[in-house]
């Protein structure tokens, strides 16, 4: 028994071809799906056999299932015409080229789910796009593409055409974290508009802003920066699970818990963050011994994703916070964010000390040239992910 899955997208415009494909032996789930497709017809999604010409099906047999509801004869003509012929030719050529073993052609069946946009018109594009997509989907299925290593490499680099690139993890440090402590939403939005897009810039929704407008202020910020990574700085001291859930419900990507909170509160907050798919920060501002505090949290069975060594605005005459970053990373599997006293001229020193996340606030948000200030910091950091990679389908 053999069961394989493949997928491919080729082309552009309304004629773009997107093929989801199952190929397998007749005694596998592929065989059951093939039989069900032909036996259980659905209005607007009637499956049809792929034929090279009338009265000549392919080997292996292939059934085509329209993804988009067929509502008129124009759409039906495109499915029963160029799409059907393209899938059939792709299957036959896959056998001829050895993608599907010739000696096993009678053992396999193919189920191809085909997308034809209601506004598609150019039959030549429909044919060639669907031919290429079907053959590529078969090849990927037979090669078990992608392997797990490819998926893990690509998952944070991928740009989805309808969604964009959504950061859910801080996987490629260092990052510039811009702390937005301005308690005026109008001014905040003006600042955001001036900050260049980069997947190495993340935004901290500061406590004053969150207190004034509530957690869901993030939704307002997403109107300007929809794909950005937002850290909601609640400085949680109690009900850690509740506040972490509130952050997640507001589409925050991370929540900040105070290191001064009871250990039980921190643990509940971290676990709720894990449950809801967001990251957890523990802010060590005013914590006398951050390493000891982390040991206590670890002993309780958890660790945050990020530890923030935070020198408060009112304490900027104290020792730079990044001096402790290396020691923390030696003992704990966490990212370290540092805040306070960071300027473009000392960014490289801070990173060399072990910081993964550089937190700046007024140096950007109060700058006369916001974009210029950001670029000064970013000049000491990495370029965007795959900025110099030539992308085709992959």
From Swiss-Prot:
The EC number(s) this enzyme carries: 4.2.1.147, 4.1.2.43
Residue ranges of the region described as 3-hexulose-6-phosphate synthase: 163-394
Lyase keyword on record: yes
Keyword Lyase tagged: yes
Protein keywords: Carbohydrate metabolism, Lyase, Multifunctional enzyme
Enzyme superclass (EC): lyase
Gene Ontology MF terms: 3-dehydro-L-gulonate-6-phosphate decarboxylase activity; carbon-nitrogen lyase activity; hexulose-6-phosphate synthase activity; hydro-lyase activity; orotidine-5'-phosphate decarboxylase activity
Pathway: Carbohydrate biosynthesis; D-ribose 5-phosphate biosynthesis
Region annotation (Formaldehyde-activating enzyme) ranges: 1-162
CDD domains: KGPDC_HPS
Active site (catalytic residues): 18
Binding site for substrate: 20, 49, 67, 69, 84
GO BP: 'de novo' pyrimidine nucleobase biosynthetic process; carbohydrate biosynthetic process; L-ascorbic acid catabolic process
Catalytic reactions on record: 5,6,7,8-tetrahydromethanopterin + formaldehyde = 5,10-methylenetetrahydromethanopterin + H2O; D-ribulose 5-phosphate + formaldehyde = D-arabino-hex-3-ulose 6-phosphate
Domain of life from the UniProt record: Archaea
Job of this protein: Catalyzes the condensation of formaldehyde with tetrahydromethanopterin (H(4)MPT) to 5,10-methylenetetrahydromethanopterin.
NCBIfam families attached to this UniProt entry: one_C_fae, PRK13307.1
Similarity comment: family membership: In the N-terminal section; belongs to the formaldehyde-activating enzyme family.
Record protein name field: Bifunctional enzyme Fae/Hps
Organism: Archaeoglobus fulgidus (strain ATCC 49558 / DSM 4304 / JCM 9628 / NBRC 100126 / VC-16)
Lineage of producing organism: Archaea, Methanobacteriati, Methanobacteriota, Archaeoglobi, Archaeoglobales
Gene: fae-hps
């Amino acid at each position: 028994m053999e069961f394989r899955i493949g997928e491919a997208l080729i082309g552009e415009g309304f004629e773009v071809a997107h093929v989801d494909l199952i190929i397998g032996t007749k005694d596998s789930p592929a065989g059951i799906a093939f039989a069900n497709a032909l036996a259980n017809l659905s209005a607007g999604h009637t499956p049809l056999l792929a034929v090279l010409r009338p009265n000549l099906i392919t080997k292996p047999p292939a059934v085509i299932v329209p993804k988009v509801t067929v509502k008129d004869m124009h759409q039906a003509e495109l499915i029963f015409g160029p799409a059907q012929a393209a899938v059939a030719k792709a299957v036959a050529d896959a056998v001829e080229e050895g993608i599907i073993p010739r000696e096993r052609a009678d053992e396999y069946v193919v189920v191809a789910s085909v997308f034809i946009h209601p506004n598609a018109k150019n039959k030549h594009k429909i044919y060639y796009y669907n031919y290429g997509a079907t053959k590529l989907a078969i090849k990927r299925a037979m090669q078990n593409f992608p392997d797990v290593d490819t998926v893990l490499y690509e998952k944070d680099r991928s740009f989805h055409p309808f969604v964009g690139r959504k950061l859910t993890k801080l996987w490629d440090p260092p990052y510039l974290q811009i702390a937005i402590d301005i308690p005026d939403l109008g001014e905040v939005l003006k600042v955001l508009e001036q900050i260049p897009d980069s997947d190495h810039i993340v935004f901290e929704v500061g406590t004053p802003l969150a207190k004034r407008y509530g957690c869901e202020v993030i939704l307002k910020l997403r109107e300007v920066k929809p794909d950005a990574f937002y850290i909601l700085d609640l400085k949680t001291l109690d009900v850690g699970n509740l506040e972490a859930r509130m952050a997640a419900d507001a589409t925050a990507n991370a929540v900040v818990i105070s290191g001064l909170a009871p250990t039980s509160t921190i643990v509940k907050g971290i676990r709720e963050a894990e449950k809801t798919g967001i990251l957890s920060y523990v802010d060590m501002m005013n914590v006398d011994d951050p390493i000891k505090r982390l040991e206590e949290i670890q002993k309780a069975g958890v660790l945050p994703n990020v530890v923030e060594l935070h020198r408060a605005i009112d304490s900027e005459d104290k020792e730079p916070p990044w001096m402790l970053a290396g020691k923390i990373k030696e003992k704990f599997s966490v990212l370290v964010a540092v805040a306070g006293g960071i300027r473009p001229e000392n960014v490289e020193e801070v990173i060399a000390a072990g910081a993964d996340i550089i937190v700046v606030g007024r140096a950007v948000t109060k700058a006369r040239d916001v974009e210029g200030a950001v670029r000064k910091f970013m000049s000491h950091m990495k370029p965007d992910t795959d900025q110099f990679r030539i992308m085709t389908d992959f």
